[in-house]
Structures are given as C-alpha cells and as structure tokens.
C-alpha cells in the first residue's frame, strides 16, 4: 500500500456497527447527535495528527492511538461508544439540570471536540444550568479556533451544532 494513502471508513457503516455493540443502549446522546459528532470528526482507520497535532484514529479517538497501527471499523465503533460515554459521564458532573435533547447533543458534540474540562468550564454550561437554552446555544460559535487561529472546519461544525441546538431551545 502506498504510505501516502489514507485508509478511511464510512461513518454510516461504523455507526451501524456501533448500534450493535454493548454500551450503545447506555448512551444519552441521540442517534442524530452521534451523526453530528461523527460527520465532523470523520472516520479514519489509520492514525493521523489532527489540526491540534494530536494523534487520532477512528471517529475522533485520541485514546491509545499508536502511530502507524491500522484499526478495524469495529474497533472504531467501540472506541466511539466508549468516548461518547466518557464525555457524557464527565458532563453529568457539571450539568446540573435536565436538558432538552438537541441542546444536550450539541453540548456533547462540543465537549467531544474541545474536551470535557473546557466544556464544563464554559459559559454554555453556565447558561444550561440556568436553563437559558438559546443563550447556551449561541455560545457555540465562539469555539472556532485552534491554538488561537480561526478554523473554517470548526466554524462549519459549530454552525451545524448551533442549528441543531436551537431546535431544542
């Protein structure tokens, strides 16, 4: 295989596999929310360095990634479920109220992307805990920078998260 060839996977196929795995039924993120995350994370079976320089594989997985080691679609699906469950568990510690599904999905997508510590310390979570759903949603467009530099891909992602979030606000 050509070393410059990127081995990708189909997000839809990996999500279909994920739906059959243990842990899927424990997720609080909706199927649409999972698609939102997965569509912007993309899916790669070979590790790569993301815009922030972090080794990544599968659908946005940064845990236990071994540069040069190809994974399977089933491994990508399993790590995706594990990672979303981890994000949800961390958000449970800082989100103190019941949240409309679309707002929750958008928050999980943000936290999956920027980290749960950043999400939990955000104004978005502050507004969520005050049940100010629209105000919370409108915090999403602030998260469009990588190391201080505007990122058009993040801008697109946040616009889609905002649109989804507002449907529940």
Which ranges hold each PLM region?
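Short alpha-helical scaffolding segments that buttress acidic/His motifs in well-ordered protein cores
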Residues: 37, 103-112, 139-141
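Amphipathic alpha-helical segments that form the core helices of the histone-fold
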Residues: 57-62, 108-112
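A structure-centric signal for secondary-structure junctions around beta-strands
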Residues: 51-54, 104
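Long, amphipathic alpha-helical surface segments
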Residues: 1-52, 61-65, 71-88, 96-98, ...
């Amino acid at each position: 295989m050509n070393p410059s060839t990127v081995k990708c996977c189909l997000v839809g196929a990996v999500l279909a596999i994920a739906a059959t795995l243990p842990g899927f039924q424990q997720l609080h993120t909706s199927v649409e929310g999972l698609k939102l995350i997965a569509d912007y994370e993309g899916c790669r079976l070979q590790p790569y360095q993301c815009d922030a320089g972090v080794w990544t594989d599968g659908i946005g997985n940064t845990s236990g990634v071994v540069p040069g080691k190809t994974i399977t679609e089933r491994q990508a699906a399993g790590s995706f479920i594990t990672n979303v469950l981890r994000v949800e568990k961390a958000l449970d510690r800082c989100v103190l109220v019941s949240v409309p599904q679309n707002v929750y999905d958008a928050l999980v997508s943000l936290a999956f992307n920027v980290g749960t510590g950043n999400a939990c310390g955000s104004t978005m979570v502050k507004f969520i805990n005050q049940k100010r759903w629209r105000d919370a949603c409108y915090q999403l467009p602030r998260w469009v920078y990588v190391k201080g530099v505007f990122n058009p891909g993040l801008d697109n992602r946040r616009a889609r998260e905002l649109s989804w979030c507002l449907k529940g606000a």
